[in-house]
Amino acid sequence: MSKVCQVTGKRPVTGNRVSHSNIKTKRRFEPNLHHHRFWVESEKRFVRLRVSSKGMRIIDKKGIDSVLADIRSRGNRV
């Protein structure tokens, strides 16, 4: 499974690991993803999403129904 947040679209980015002697090697910055079950009252069921911590805050703010509508409008099946 890809490491992409289903709410925000956050994905890994690349950067440099820098040693004490300033030698740079490539590394990946991974998003803080979690599999989380959300109760959807309108559908009377749980929905399991792969979301970042930022995505969880967005769901708390906007509500799960609004966020699911956005995800489904992008063509993703939930």
Swiss-Prot record:
GO terms for cellular component: cytosolic large ribosomal subunit. GO terms for molecular function: structural constituent of ribosome. Keywords: Ribonucleoprotein, Ribosomal protein. The keyword Ribonucleoprotein applies. Signal peptide: none annotated. GO terms for biological process: translation. SUPFAM superfamilies: L28p-like. Gene3D superfamilies: Ribosomal protein L28/L24. Pfam families: Ribosomal_L28 (PF00830). HAMAP family: Ribosomal_bL28. This is Large ribosomal subunit protein bL28. The gene is rpmB.
